[in-house]
């Protein structure tokens, strides 16, 4: 594929993603917290710090992998980097493959580090990238961690996508052993099963982003790019973020589980943390905010989001993310059925 074609595809992804709406029905609504009437904590007591295995996040929120690889997406990445810098949240870039193939595209990613020299930044490659290119991707951004995205459904619906996946697990193992920063294996909106998480744990992966169904839908995005748009029936493929977090329960002591996919509100984010996530990522909400309303309004949105998380934690009478993981929740019959049929040990 030519560089112009790749740049066009990057722009198409952003345009279609921005046009997608939030899910009207979400598994986050299948969870209820138990309200206790008299909190013993004040809002100012709430500590949103999240301690991961290799670094500390001042806020349990991050701008998740989105874009890069074109002039337009360079501008988007620069604006998002300002948001990350000013609010102190972490940020991931989209797949750096374009920059690894063509050095002219490198600035569309490195602009993030240039804009936010002291922030926590995740670089991003695919599961099929050669190990030396994974190392190069980390250097490109002086990244604190490397996301490796696994996106088989997207590739299979993408007209020009990959059709070979049997080497992915072995390649992931090699990347983990060679890269000198933490490796985050990240889904792209299809969720993860306990079997996948177990396999990743066995090859030394200590971070996964379960990235469940409910947010940006890459089956729908790639189907829009197909001549006959003939694979729309796969639009609900995969596990939701809630189902994926439940699937991860047995591995939350050994691994840091990150949650993303369809997080709409601060309440959704708090539910992710209560289900065992160490941090919560969002992509499209930040993209839509910064492109439609600008940097100042996006800063206000981000600060309001974390402030509301503190208020919810106050109502739950918990001071820390660690305390939140012990809070009481009630699951709907739908989620309880998933837990029972999948044989999940969630407490």
UniProtKB/Swiss-Prot annotation:
GO MF entries: FMN binding; isopentenyl-diphosphate delta-isomerase activity; magnesium ion binding; NADPH binding; oxidoreductase activity
Keywords attached to this entry: Cytoplasm, Flavoprotein, FMN, Isomerase, Isoprene biosynthesis, Magnesium, Metal-binding, NADP
Reaction(s) catalysed (UniProt annotation): isopentenyl diphosphate = dimethylallyl diphosphate
UniProt-annotated location(s): Cytoplasm
Positions contributing to Mg(2+) binding: 155
Chief localisation class: cytoplasm
InterPro entries: Aldolase_TIM (IPR013785), FMN-dep_DH (IPR000262), IPdP_isomerase (IPR011179)
Any one Pfam family match given in the protein's UniProt record, by short name: FMN_dh
Gene Ontology biological process terms in this record: isoprenoid biosynthetic process
EC annotation from Swiss-Prot or TrEMBL: 5.3.3.2
Domain of life: Bacteria
Function: Involved in the biosynthesis of isoprenoids. Catalyzes the 1,3-allylic rearrangement of the homoallylic substrate isopentenyl (IPP) to its allylic isomer, dimethylallyl diphosphate (DMAPP).
PANTHER family: ISOPENTENYL-DIPHOSPHATE DELTA-ISOMERASE
Record HAMAP family: Idi_2
Family: Belongs to the IPP isomerase type 2 family.
Listed name of the protein: Isopentenyl-diphosphate delta-isomerase
Organism: Staphylococcus saprophyticus subsp. saprophyticus (strain ATCC 15305 / DSM 20229 / NCIMB 8711 / NCTC 7292 / S-41)
Lineage of origin: Bacteria, Bacillati, Bacillota, Bacilli, Bacillales
Name of encoding gene: fni
